[in-house]
Amino acid sequence: MTLRIGIIGTGAIGTDHARRINRVLSGAEVTAVTDVNRDSAEACVAGVAPGAQILGSAEEVIAASDAVLVCSWGTAHETQVLAAIAAGKPCFCEKPLATEAYGARRIVEAEEAMGRRLVQVGFMRRYDRGYVALKETVRTRLGPPLMIHAAHRNPSVPGRYRTPMAIHDTLIHEIDVLRWLLDDEYVSAQVIFPRATRHTHAGLRDPQIVLLETAKGVRIDVEIFVNCRYGYDIQCEVVGEEGTARLPEPTAIPTRLGAVFGQPILMDWKDRFIDSYDVELQDFLKAAAQGTAAGPSAWDGYAAAITADVCVQAQERPGAILPVTLPARPALYA
């Protein structure tokens, strides 16, 4: 059976997922789309989803599909995911699951009431080959992890990007993937602001350093520098009792030209994790065909949202160490 996929939100990521489903992956096709900007929906259909109908609302797309992808603005995610759960439809939701932790909690409660998993959150780094290999190395060779040094650097961000977005739009990936990497929970967060780059603007403090502590005592420092200029650069080094392990660099051709040894650095986040997007979405389609969901769960989205909210509070109190408190994990997500 070919799954009928509906896409809510046909911006860059929604359209790219439509291309992925129709041209790269197996077992599904995009049959319905919607977007608040009809021109965007029409461009998506014309470019990568010629068989899809354009509908007027998220509710119509959910009703017309076997499973849905929520790729709209983050503020709309909670309502649209809850509607998919109420309809019993598997739902892939791009991050954030909700813009506030209490919204993510409502999604968890709705899924619990349904009695089965229906939601997968788009934390694609868990599917990246480098992170998968790093997790296995941490598990089998390093001994107990002691520290993590990480960095998330973007060449630039638009003028509408503000200080809290460094947490909810950028650090959110590290919040999830490092929790997964360590199989551990956060207990505190702290934010420090170094000297600001001249390439930022009045509404954005850049760079930032976020310090996290886990229940097992692991200390994590994450540099967020979203106007670094030179490229899109993701770094992660785990320090264990027996040694260290580092996330590998993306595959690129090193050159020796003009008396210079060099290797290119990617500029676009889509290029850095393009393969992991394919793997995560195929994982969703496989589970959706069985009427359920796999991969990062609504609970993972909720845990990330709680941590992100505390980090934003820590931005407002630079240097203060604030507690991160998670409720007990429900049996559905054990």
From Swiss-Prot:
**Which Gene3D superfamilies does the annotation name?**
Dihydrodipicolinate Reductase, domain 2, NAD(P)-binding Rossmann-like Domain
> Which Pfam families does the annotation name?
GFO_IDH_MocA, GFO_IDH_MocA_C
Membrane-spanning residues where?
none
UniProt KW keywords? NAD, Oxidoreductase
Task: Return the EC number.
Answer: 1.1.1.18
**Which SUPFAM superfamilies does this chain map to?**
Glyceraldehyde-3-phosphate dehydrogenase-like, C-terminal domain, NAD(P)-binding Rossmann-fold domains
Keyword Cell cycle among UniProt keywords: no
| Example GO BP | inositol catabolic process
Keyword NAD tagged: yes
Q: Which family does it belong to?
A: Belongs to the Gfo/Idh/MocA family.
- Role according to the record: Involved in the oxidation of myo-inositol (MI) to 2-keto-myo-inositol (2KMI or 2-inosose).
Q: Note the HAMAP family from the entry.
A: IolG (MF_01671)
Under what name is this protein listed? Inositol 2-dehydrogenase
